[in-house]
């Protein structure tokens, strides 16, 4: 039993993905971001302190309850208040658990093996002070450096989201850089991260528990990365919708062909309607519907194009000899069969 009197539950490595998928199927693909910015606290008439951040968070939880699949807490917004801020985050995480809401802590942790156990103690293990369903990770030490922490999460029925293609413009130069060595030599950094993450989901039936962060604002940049979200079987956390500029058309561009595993996070776009709980709830419901429809159209358009291509190919083969496809590289030169990307590779771009 932990300090809040909660009994630990028997867990499986696939638990987080299963629970998140159930909530997404029931409530839609919206994750409400709980980010107590100074300006929002002031606009709401709350004190800019730990107490104000906690009051704001509790109100956002009420709006999200029964209307969104998950909530995401931005830890720096609590860290700025020191120990009182962390205590506030503990309490709102506990409240979310009591309400049955899936929680994601956006802490962007990472590091060496010496720090992994400490992070697991804080977020994953029974009795953890900041017990969450999932946290975000930063793979700058190398995606494989996260393996131990991922195992800790999965062994405790939790999940992770690894930053792969972020919504900030500064990320492009690093994330689309070509790797010079290792297993994914010649591929982009983002491709290597996505492929490494997918390995943890490969043997899981249904949606896995190791996810990616792919921003909704990246647009056609998704093609430069070599990452195909449609071939990734874990959850995808997507910031950038609303306040940061992404619209429904951007979701359809980036997540074309995906099938129910994209979780769109929206924070200030919802919070701007507060503090009135009725207005917050209405905004949450409206945005949830918009996001669901955009992602549904992304899937349907992809399938429609595939059906059209299949029909055209069928008509062509009725009157012509069998076609032989010769793979080419980006410069139009033929590749050897050894260099051909396999369809089963989850991070391969959809060509």
Where do the language-model regions lie?
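Active-site mouth loops of central-metabolism enzymes
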Residues: 40-56, 109-113, 177-185
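Acidic (Asp/Glu)-rich catalytic clusters
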Residues: 24-25, 61-67, 93-98, 150-156, ...
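Conserved N-terminal beta1-alpha1 strand-loop-helix module at the mouth
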Residues: 3-73, 79-91, 97-98, 102-104, ...
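Conserved anion-binding
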Residues: 111-211
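Conserved, mostly hydrophobic/aromatic
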Residues: 32, 71, 106, 135, ...
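Catalytic beta/alpha-barrel core
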Residues: 72, 80-81, 104, 133-142, ...
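A C-terminal functional module that forms or caps the active site or interfaces directly
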Residues: 212, 217-265, 269-270
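C-terminal helical cap(s) of enzyme catalytic domains, especially alpha/beta-barrels
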Residues: 251-257, 261, 272-306
